[in-house]
From Swiss-Prot:
The chain crosses the membrane at residues 13-33, 75-95, 113-133, 174-194, 208-230. One of its GO terms (molecular function) is proton-transporting ATP synthase activity, rotational mechanism. F-type ATPases have 2 components, CF(1) - the catalytic core - and CF(0) - the membrane proton channel. CF(1) has five subunits: alpha(3), beta(3), gamma(1), delta(1), epsilon(1). CF(0) has three main subunits: a(1), b(2) and c(9-12). The alpha and beta chains form an alternating ring which encloses part of the gamma chain. CF(1) is attached to CF(0) by a central stalk formed by the gamma and epsilon chains, while a peripheral stalk is formed by the delta and b chains. Key component of the proton channel; it plays a direct role in the translocation of protons across the membrane. InterPro entries: ATP_syn_F0_a_bact/chloroplast (IPR045082), ATP_synth_F0_asu (IPR000568), ATP_synth_F0_asu_AS (IPR023011), F0_ATP_A_sf (IPR035908). The gene is atpB. Keywords: ATP synthesis, Cell membrane, CF(0), Hydrogen ion transport, Ion transport, Membrane, Transmembrane, Transmembrane helix, Transport. Belongs to the ATPase A chain family. It is a multi-pass membrane protein. Pfam families: ATP-synt_A. GO terms for biological process: proton motive force-driven plasma membrane ATP synthesis. This is ATP synthase subunit a.
Length: 239
């Protein structure tokens, strides 16, 4: 049965209520986590402060590997925020799934929706163009991004912009959506076959949840890494 959506509109624009609520919940969780981990910080970190400092250093490592060293501080906060948002978004719907009424889903991963992932991808691609123009000016940006090292590659580079958007967004969507679908199939099997499969279904569900969370972490890492790679293509001078 096709999953129903909690739709509402503001003028001519329609929204998925579940996705809106889950995105807001993701933002609240990220903010609360960072707030809790950065209260009463000490010179010698321990506990929650150790976790947040490890995450900050981890993200700094991603940026350092893909951007010039002088640019690390400029994009560190953006990359950290993006990583945390994508990570929490990936995990939310893998921990549990709530369906009420006539197959109406009220709890799912925001990144299991292609509109969310493609919007995130579009946002990052637009930001790469913005920072490229800020660095080189409009004319210099066009020359550096599309006419170097040779001008006849212009059609290929224009196509690359489109493919970068699709691969960045659809890769994330596909992995998270597939994880949720399989979890739903396992739960559906228990409901349709009978309680006697629970001893097999529970360990299988737990294993797949753990694997899906691992995949969610990897996908957050890949999304941020590719975003920084695309950013470096726009703000570094092409030889």
């Amino acid at each position: 049965m096709e999953e129903k959506k909690l739709l509402f509109n503001i003028g001519p624009i329609w929204f998925d209520g579940t996705i809106v609520l889950m995105v807001l919940l993701t933002c609240i969780i990220v903010f609360a986590f960072v707030y809790a981990c950065t209260r009463n910080m000490k010179l010698r970190p321990k506990g929650k402060q150790t976790v947040i400092e490890w995450l900050v250093d981890f993200i700094r490592g991603i940026i350092t590997d893909n951007l010039p060293r002088k640019e690390v501080s400029n994009f560190h906060l953006m990359a950290f925020t993006l990583f945390m948002f994508v990570l929490v978004s990936n995990i939310l719907g893998l921990v549990t799934k709530i369906v009420v009424g006539d197959d109406l889903s009220v709890w799912k991963s925001p990144t299991a929706d292609p509109i969310v992932t493609l919007t995130l991808a579009m946002m990052m691609i637009v930001l790469t163009h913005f920072f490229g123009m800020k660095r080189f000016g409009f004319k210099g940006y066009l020359v550096n991004s599309y006419l170097r090292p040779v001008g006849f590659l212009l059609p290929v580079k224009l196509m690359e912009e489109f493919t970068n958007l699709l691969t960045l967004g659809l890769r994330l969507y596909g992995n998270i959506f597939a994880g949720e679908v399989l979890l739903g199939l396992i739960a559906g099997t228990v409901a349709s076959v009978g309680l006697w499969v629970i001893p097999l279904a529970i360990p299988l569900e737990m294993i797949w949840v753990a694997f899906s969370i691992f995949i969610g972490c990897i996908q957050a890492f890949i999304f941020v890494t590719l975003s920084m790679v695309y950013m470096s293509h726009k703000i570094e001078t092409e030889e």
